[in-house]
Amino acid sequence: KQSSNKVNETMASSNQRFQMCLHAFQIISPKIEVSNFELNSSSPSYTINTVRWILNKFPECELSIIIGEDQGALLATWHEFEALQKLVSFICFSRNHFEVNPQIQLIYIDNLNFEISSTEFRNLLNSDPEKAKLMLHPQVFDYIQNNNLYLC
């Protein structure tokens, strides 16, 4: 489902994004499970709901949520953020040096050369598809092309 922070963005459908995740993660490890919990839920897609579901299913696991620094700056606005930060750690890719509340505990990852946001990447798919292709697993890029996703 679409994030409540991105209500008006043109997005792939929920099922299309799920399919892209399946393509992307199947090559990493057969132990990775891509869940459709949020797609099947009738309630809004809040991260806290998904985290609670995962912890109920896998009570022994430790969860981390990987975000870009742009979302790090918005964390305090996330639904039930106070409860969420007690359940997970946040790993934040440092990108554009957004102002992040110093009270929020983030594990920063620097120097990974991800100087592009997801919105900028979707724009790149239109402006320079060959460059965008170099940034994706071939199966994911082919899926995007075959389904005419993110075209302006």
Write out the residue ranges for each language-model feature.
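Nucleotidyltransferase catalytic core that binds NTPs
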Residues: K1-C152
